[in-house]
Amino acid sequence: MPRGGSPTPRTIPADPIYGSTLVAKLINKIMIGGKKSKAEKIVYEALRIASEQLNEDPIAVLTKAIENTKPLVETRSRRIGGAVYQIPVEVPERRALALALRWIVNGARDRGAGEMEKKLAAELVDAYKGQGYAAKRREEIHRMAEANKAFAHLRW
């Protein structure tokens, strides 16, 4: 615990094209080795492709894709009397957003060969429809929490 109280969360400036912090966070997740301009090109092109496929506003596509992949509950390990229990806990909003973005990016990276723009667009479209890697991860997490609901009273 820091003596000066809890640290204030960093504020990420909105991206210049859409004026959205969500897009800026996605760009930062895509970025590898500090190559931000390359990450921006990938994200903007992916959003353009996804919005054309769905005939929807790019920000609306991204927002719905993230909403469909945000976990509501997850399990945390807790050791009680020599046994380790998986205890379901609610996911804070910031962590839920971080997990959703991470799963979308990882799902795009795991999609075989091809350009990252197209893979990210495909993952965004799948997440928008509630399918794909990110949605599958969310369902796994929810299933795990549901299976361990009996230990919810052990929450700390």
From Swiss-Prot:
Keyword rRNA-binding found: yes
Similarity comment text for this entry: Belongs to the universal ribosomal protein uS7 family.
Any one Gene Ontology cellular component term annotated for this protein: small ribosomal subunit
Segments forming a coiled coil: none
Stored InterPro entries: Ribosomal_uS7, Ribosomal_uS7_bac/org-type, Ribosomal_uS7_CS, Ribosomal_uS7_dom, Ribosomal_uS7_dom_sf
This protein's name: Small ribosomal subunit protein uS7
An example Gene Ontology molecular-function term: structural constituent of ribosome
PANTHER family, per database record: RIBOSOMAL PROTEIN S7
Purpose of the protein: One of the primary rRNA binding proteins, it binds directly to 16S rRNA where it nucleates assembly of the head domain of the 30S subunit. Is located at the subunit interface close to the decoding center, probably blocks exit of the E-site tRNA.
Subunit structure as annotated in this protein's UniProt entry: Part of the 30S ribosomal subunit. Contacts proteins S9 and S11.
BP-aspect Gene Ontology terms: translation
NCBIfam families recorded: rpsG_bact (TIGR01029)
Alphabetic keyword roster: Ribonucleoprotein, Ribosomal protein, RNA-binding, rRNA-binding, tRNA-binding
